[in-house]
Amino acid sequence: MKKIILIAFSFGILSVNAQQIKLEPGKKITSTSTADMDMDMGMGGQMKIKSSSVNVLSITGSDDKNYKGTNTITKMTMSQEGMGQSTEYDSDKKGDRDSETGKALGKELDKPVQILIDRTTGKATESNPEKTTEPEADTNPMAGVMGGMSEKTAAAMVSSAFFIIPQGKKAGDKWSDSTTEAGIKGVRNYELQSISKEEATILLKIVSKGVISKEIQGMQMEMNMNTTAQSIIRTNVTTGLVKKNSTTGTVEGTLDMMGQSMPISMKMSSEVVFE
């Protein structure tokens, strides 16, 4: 009986603390992410890409609804092999920063972005969003293609640092939601795999499909993509802060450009650790 009471008490703590994230002014959250991607674009057009980045979220204040802060990308690395070429980039190396690749990848480096974080949902928005340009796409079509497939705003980076478990959920419970953004419709299915007084593990399965349109060198390009992905998320149930997110996924689709259609197949994996 005592054990049952303790378990019930743990669930009670989860239900209360999951309602809002908890942050203190001056707190810094560092996220270190790594990603691997293998892509096949048909006709021998294969490419391997490895990348990593470090983001620092600094909490500067709060009000009744939001936390205020800044998000800064402090480090980026990338290696790319394919189509007879290879590229290496490390933002810590001055020579790499001054290269064409460095100028394209480093445009957001060390640039603080003002962020608002909803206390209840953990969703982040940019306080003063700026319209970004993509000069690299004018001279490098592949950069434009990759940009269209991997765009991630500062707000999205920050949002991934938080996970709010719906009130009353217990181990084994499942729920779902859906999103529509930038021409992509997705369905997300969650399962609360385990929970303790301080930590929970969530299995997230995502299925999405849609079309992304971009203009590169005056030419219209469309990417039709069907994506399936699976994530294991470890989160602190008291604060709502994610500790680790590990994801694997596949993309199948086509790239339509200049009257031609090219098949695209991609496998990807990523890991983000928050400290």
Ranges and model annotations:
Residues 1-23:
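Bacterial Sec-dependent N-terminal signal peptides
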